[in-house]
């Protein structure tokens, strides 16, 4: 017979781990024994048991060993790792940090190496090498070197400045001092000399030099307060608590010097809120968790002195582990721009090859027979053609713009500053400006298709107020009519009878106060007592007043409510908690705290009363609480009805319950609890299992209801974004009914919206899968690509789905593995093949079902996913990214939104009440959801339009410049001779045409910000990629080709058979080059003037200044003086003055410019007249629209002030805090439909643009 231990063990190497999400499988128990009672081969049992013992002996989680006050212990040979060949170093890092990248010797080679890893820079380096070969190059070396040095120099200077700053910062930090036990006494040493195992002393306002275990503190109850602003951006204080035994014995220097504790813990990692370890001391073991660890970068506050043991130092600390490279996000335009550069490169190769073939043919037909062209070498025509191929690669290299990427980064940097400087996105109440935390994604803000938003703190204010409650089936908090109770009044409840009341709670139900004071219903007092004792809040006193420090607004609201109703939490230690119960102080022994996590969705505390009885108090989500209630709870239905009512009013709810525990039961359970607490591996899973054993047969007390108001401007913002064809999905931890009512409150849902729930979706997807399978044969994957809509066109549909249904629909539900012993038998090839095919079919089915779900959801006008975890939020975002190829934006304010924010193309953080984790992980941040409309509809749209105009013009001007060489090659024997002076080629992209296009990319705007917000339909140009795509690219290419033809052939025709004023023919090569170059500079600068929609003095100055700069430099470079100094570099002596004094040369230039620009002007006029865009129509009427905006102020159609609908209590998803969720039925309230409002706005917009 197999033992119980064996029956719980799986040895199948292909089995999935318990916590992994796997699809449904029909062969889940393929290798399991059918009969548990069958006799198992003894040898196999023995092998399995030995393998299990071996696996237990090897501790994967806790392999980091630290011994206090013993540096030699950490220098043992088995702690040394081989770094390079025979060079070894200790696995324990020193505490010196090194964030800089270069030093005085390595800066130049390393920086150049990093820069030449970029394809564009390496390409131009190859060109520079080719230009050094005389047989190939017809261009001077400086034509490529000067632009390349400019690009490399700017980047190198930026990198040098950054690295010098890092050097200074590292030196400053490493040279900070700290007190460390050395030779039995505290001595002051530098941070860089601290080592793992050292015992250190820290004082108030000291920075923590390493990750340390808190040993003792001068504060009562071994508390230590820290500020974690450098870790997570939060300025509110957090508390840490030492072990009672270390705090008791390690207060004086002598005891600290002789402390010889031994720690086994997890290896260094980047999880800031997780730590697992065990302290072995005095023949006892003590569990360690994150609450006992002080992390490097934090600051000691409100604590005079504390002592700690260094566990991780330097590069091993958690803050350094988190300083690695973040995932680099790139925009859609980035990818498209790279593909276009590749296209240009291919065109360059093809054109160069064609011209090289032409040169080989010309050499064979003409060159070999022309004695005056003999160069002394008897090379074959094909060899000369081969050399000329590389010559044309050099001459035409400006088709691939070297300054493109630098210019793009400059424009993005400027656009980011405009976002930072926007006062209309500044929240004065909290002094919080908008912040562009990345500079590479601005134009993508103008292409968003889907917004994924958290609810609590994002759509709502996350300022919690206790409003109602249900106790023993009775609802309290509503106004009570005088007929119901003679003493009830409508005015606010007076809490002056309570000395601990804070005077801030607005409550109207006087009957609840009477119930508390009379004590007629013990459950009422028990209800508020539970709120005062079951929490993780800390208390301190400021000017004699109690001040609570809660990690979440929810927790603070509940504890404050209990305080106002007479049950004030006063103090806590590691083992006790003191509460004032209607003026009488009582202290309870805390026996265990059963912490919160996102899977448990509840928190419990076990206390011993002064009378000696043991009780468990629990609060959490109704879904998990109701599963654990005793079957004889008489008020279950009444409380459920109350939860429904609270949910309909969008109040955040949670359930409260308790149970009596017998001494024997607790003793048995506590032994398991202590064993799980010191488990070396899988500690969290072991604790959760132990928690489940005690949290059952609970007695329901009631439910709380907390108000969380909508933020200002949320409905208006959502309406405008909807008009911009942006779909909004709300992903929240709230229950279905609460989330639905929030949807109505923020106008995401309307009364004529048809809502589909999980059952409906599952049925639709099942039908679609069957149809696809029938059409496609064996697998839906091979179904014909015919898209059929799920709903009839024109229907207003919304989708509301819970996390459990999401797993069900997407085949992501966890499967429970059987506890039957699996034996590992060899499989035949046929069995492996069948198993592989089965898995492949499951993956295909899963993939097709996911795609169908995304198609269905994207047909809906709104999607609300409720009861979802942080992992599910990220999964939903990823599904839309994967199957719709749409640009996504995720916005949230809490730690549970970080994964979603990082997954989306654009992440936006709200700096709210839940700390700064979301902000620090985001690409953009601000304080209010309503600023999102300005970020997208103004800054995003402007950035997209500017970048598109910049890229189109940049490619155009480079093609117009470069292809003149192409036309010239037909007249010079395809000899790779340039059409311009070398210095003009060098400075064209650097000085003559760079500033105007940069300013257009920074300042241009088609319509004002007010009109952009007034007409959100303008936003669709970015969503549809209308302004920059391959079609636009080839139009710009064709425009450049035609411009180059005009620039070459008109001057060529003008120079043929002409005579100057002096009777001589000026048709020399140098005069021709000056004429073409002058016409080119004027044309491309005037062209950008035609492309500019928003004129400023700066734009005008840059255009005319660039032309003036060209002529000034040209006359200087063509002067005799500079030729005398540098005769080989400046060979166009006198060309400019001689050529440009001829009137017909100016006439030629003017004619060339006119022929280039007049067709553009004509096409623009016809386009705006016959096929005007939406922005063209608005520009045409902007004066009238501006007058209307000024004189006809319309009243907003949206309600302002406090909304009657409120938010519900959502998941916290943070370890250590109770999970607060609501449940109930949705009770819709009749409202004026939003469609009418939108229709009015749309009609006005159409009337405006059509008139």
Curated annotation (Swiss-Prot):
Transmembrane segments: 122-142, 145-165, 340-360, 386-406, 953-973, 983-1003, 1033-1053, 1072-1092, 1095-1115, 1143-1163
Keywords assigned by UniProt, alphabetized: ATP-binding, Cell membrane, Cell projection, Endoplasmic reticulum, Golgi apparatus, Hearing, Lipid transport, Magnesium, Membrane, Metal-binding, Nucleotide-binding, Phosphoprotein, Translocase, Transmembrane, Transmembrane helix, Transport
Exoplasmic loop side: 143-144, 361-385, 974-982, 1054-1071, 1116-1142
Effect of loss of the gene: Mice have unimpaired bile secretion, and no liver damage, but show mild abnormalities including depressed weight at weaning and elevated serum bile salt levels. Do not suffer from jaundice or diarrhea and have normal serum bilirubin levels and normal liver enzyme activities, except for mildly elevated serum AST (aspartate aminotransferase) activity. Display unimpaired transhepatic bile salt transport and are resistant to bile salt-induced cholestasis.
Active site: 454
Region (Disordered): 1-52
Protein localization: Cell membrane; Apical cell membrane; Cell projection, Stereocilium; Endoplasmic reticulum
Gene Ontology molecular-function annotations: aminophospholipid flippase activity; ATP binding; ATP hydrolysis activity; cardiolipin binding; lipid transporter activity; magnesium ion binding; phosphatidylcholine flippase activity; phosphatidylcholine floppase activity
Extent of Basic and acidic residues compositional bias: 43-52
A GO-annotated cellular component: cytosol
Origin: domain of life: Eukaryota
The enzyme's E.C. designation: 7.6.2.1
Short name of any one Pfam family annotated for the protein: E1-E2_ATPase
Biased composition regions of type Acidic residues, renumbered to the chain: 25-35
UniProt xrefs under NCBIfam families: ATPase-Plipid (TIGR01652), ATPase_P-type (TIGR01494)
Function: Catalytic component of a P4-ATPase flippase complex which catalyzes the hydrolysis of ATP coupled to the transport of phospholipids, in particular phosphatidylcholines (PC), from the outer to the inner leaflet of the plasma membrane. May participate in the establishment of the canalicular membrane integrity by ensuring asymmetric distribution of phospholipids in the canicular membrane. Thus may have a role in the regulation of bile acids transport into the canaliculus, uptake of bile acids from intestinal contents into intestinal mucosa or both and protect hepatocytes from bile salts.
Family (UniProt): Belongs to the cation transport ATPase (P-type) (TC 3.A.3) family. Type IV subfamily.
Name of this protein: Phospholipid-transporting ATPase IC
Species whose genome carries this gene: Mus musculus
Name of the encoding gene: Atp8b1
